[in-house]
């Protein structure tokens, strides 16, 4: 087993989700298809609710910002618009954003609310790699703080950890960050996270499967290890040489233990 030693100054472990704690297949084959298959029904069922209207309003604002993009789908204002046409416009906008792998806050918020309904109804449970929960327990026993940083909304993150095949494991996580604090490819985001936690950036070890994110974190003086999991994107030879690579959280060695 390859062992990566965690620097002594590290007191916080920051985790990505997709491809790091959770198989990409679960996200791509379960979570996202659920949105596409159910968004129209969800909107029709919840349209009059305040939460749903807030989601639609945020999507409309995003659509206005996206108006200059090729193929962007507008969402008309409610007045004078046929309800089914309105709903279809929102559905089409969601499809368009997802087809372009957009990670807008507006899209993530609606997805989070849809997943909440599905998870709380027991229609799905989140999957984690087998090494994740035992490792997080060990880290916490060693005095580490554990945080999540994902492009998925904080609400969606809490759903995953609260409704998993391992049960409710939210108690193992000290806090959550999403794109509201900044994008994961922007080094400033990691400085903001450190400020929010109340530590220095070099007190953080970030685990991610995406080297562009790892590079951004390093620019902020955050320690990184790149996680290699089944189904993840391949790495270049240079990336394999440059980064500390792990295939399991059990390969991290804490000097304090």
Swiss-Prot record:
Q: Which reaction does it catalyse?
A: 5-methylsulfanyl-2,3-dioxopentyl phosphate + H2O = 1,2-dihydroxy-5-(methylsulfanyl)pent-1-en-3-one + phosphate
Pathway terms, separated by semicolons? Amino-acid biosynthesis; L-methionine biosynthesis via salvage pathway; L-methionine from S-methyl-5-thio-alpha-D-ribose 1-phosphate: step 3/6; Amino-acid biosynthesis; L-methionine biosynthesis via salvage pathway; L-methionine from S-methyl-5-thio-alpha-D-ribose 1-phosphate: step 4/6
GO MF annotation terms: acireductone synthase activity; magnesium ion binding
Keyword line? Amino-acid biosynthesis, Cytoplasm, Hydrolase, Magnesium, Metal-binding, Methionine biosynthesis, Nucleus
Main location (coarse class): cytoplasm
Q: How is the cofactor bound?
A: Binds 1 Mg(2+) ion per subunit.
- The UniProt annotation places substrate binding at 150-151, 184
EC primary class: hydrolase
Transcription regulation as a keyword of this entry, yes or no, is no
Kindly indicate whether the keyword Amino-acid biosynthesis belongs to this entry. Answer: yes
User: Which Pfam families does the annotation name?
Assistant: Hydrolase
The residues that hold Mg(2+) are: 16, 18, 209
Cofactor(s) needed, names only, are:
Mg(2+)
**What does the entry give for GO biological process?**
L-methionine salvage from methylthioadenosine
As for subcellular location, the record says: Cytoplasm; Nucleus
According to the record's subunit comment, the protein's assembly and interactions are: Monomer.
Say which family it is in.
Belongs to the HAD-like hydrolase superfamily. MasA/MtnC family.
Q: Specify the protein name.
A: Enolase-phosphatase E1
Natural source organism: Mus musculus
